Structure formats: C-alpha cells, structure tokens
Curated annotation (Swiss-Prot):
The modification N6-(pyridoxal phosphate)lysine is found at residue 42. This is Cysteine synthase. GO terms for biological process: cysteine biosynthetic process from serine. The keyword DNA damage does not apply. Its cofactor is pyridoxal 5'-phosphate. It comes from Haemophilus influenzae (strain ATCC 51907 / DSM 11121 / KW20 / Rd). The gene is cysK.
Amino acid sequence: MAIYADNSYSIGNTPLVRLKHFGHNGNVVVKIEGRNPSYSVKCRIGANMVWQAEKDGTLTKGKEIVDATSGNTGIALAYVAAARGYKITLTMPETMSLERKRLLCGLGVNLVLTEGAKGMKGAIAKAEEIVASDPSRYVMLKQFENPANPQIHRETTGPEIWKDTDGKVDVVVAGVGTGGSITGISRAIKLDFGKQITSVAVEPVESPVISQTLAGEEVKPGPHKIQGIGAGFIPKNLDLSIIDRVETVDSDTALATARRLMAEEGILAGISSGAAVAAADRLAKLPEFADKLIVVILPSASERYLSTALFEGIEG
C-alpha cells in the first residue's frame, strides 16, 4: 500500500509543465514545487534536515528545533516537527508575509520576529542567541549550511528532473535562497548523471551579492521584494564552482512575471517563481539557448503571498 508513515515522507515527485507564453517554441518547462506536502520546495530540506539530525543523534525526543527562516523553510520544518512530535522555535524578519506568520503559528511554532532591516543575518543571530541560552535543550538545524539541504536535492529533485525529461534537460534555472536547490540539482545531473548542463542562479538586481562576489567586487546587499531569495550573503550551501551563470531580476519584473504565470499559464506562482521564470524567459530567447530545454524551479505557490505586493490592487 502507498501509505506514508507520516507527512514528511510524502515529499517530491512534483510535475514538470511546459510554458506556452514564455521562452522560445516551448523550450521552458517549470517544476512546480508547490505540490509538496507543505506546498513549497523547502519541504524537501525540512524533512531531510530533521531525518539526518535524528540519524546522527543530534535531535532526540524532548529537544526543541530552532532555526532562522524567511518563511518557507520554517513552514517545512514546522510541519515535519508537528508530524514527528517536536517543539520548534523559529526566528524570522518581521517584513515577511502575514500568511507565512499565521501558517507558522498554526503549525504550533514559537515565532520570534526580528528587525526587518537586519534581514536574514538578524534572524540567524537571534536563533543562535536562543540556542546559546540553553544548548542542551535546543538544536539549530542551520538551513544555510546544513549539508542535508543540498543532499536531498541531489537525491530527489535532480533525479526527478533527469527522469522526467528523459535526460534531455540542458539548463536548470533556480533562485538562490540557501543555495541548496541549484547546488544539489546541479551535482546530481552534472556529477551523478554526467551531463554538463548550464546551471543558472537567479538573484535580485537590488541585492546582487553572488554577481558581486564572482566579479571580485565589494558585496553590497540591498532591500528587495522577492521573498525567499537574495539573503544578502553567500550561503555555505551555495557551491559557486558549479554555477555557470548568474541572472539578476528586479522586484517589479518578478512580481509582474508571477502575475502572468497565474493569468496566462494557470500556474499559482510566488514572487521568487516569477523571478526565476523571468530569467529563464530572457535566456530562452538568446540564440545560444533557442534549442535548449530549460527547466525552472518554481519554489512556492501564490496563496502564501496574498497580503504582499503580488496581489496589490487585486480585489475579490
């Protein structure tokens, strides 16, 4: 029987859908990660970080999970914690969407909001402070550096893309939050399956820290509206050596593209999904990518952004 022991085991096997209004002659397909158990790509890493912590004895019954989140990883950790019987405290910048905050509280999270201007660095610092207050009680899973993050994408997301495209994938486009998706998928296809695809990282034009780092420039993070990517620093889980190209997208374009995905493709897409598709659409129309199969990761669905600029001016 196909019955899961708990909801954490139901991750993955999300569909690929060909876009009709983006790209060149149907060469852009999207992997809809909002079909995961708590409705985002982060379900994969939430489950695997908890599983691995249990396996290595770091996380045992009676201990409490702590981490910093911009929302989706927190929701993923929270659903896994609820399913497996753990208490959980999460820190999050106060600027994240109302939906994310309410979902976290609904899942039983002790939610600690941090100053929005300090971004994810501020949330991480607060999480570390909480853990330091009682190290025997708290376990911090550290999504930005935990190897279980890219590992699950190497074991699941990458092989799914390979299988569902019959190995014909040429380009993978993904926004960078923790760096786990693009790193794990690229390692799977390039190293395990042996195909030298083009790995494209997407970041906000307002906070182009990956581009600045690769160019040897001073890193100058900035505020933007693309929740879930552009943390303002280079995460340890981002393997820069496996990235072939970096594309920047501004917040307004990301928002407009996410709205187009809903209205023109019937795909409920969040803001970072809009950024990734905008980057892929731009690439797909270049001569060198015209005949390439481009797979884009759509991290989450639009319901998580009802109170944000994504739905500004849209009334029922």
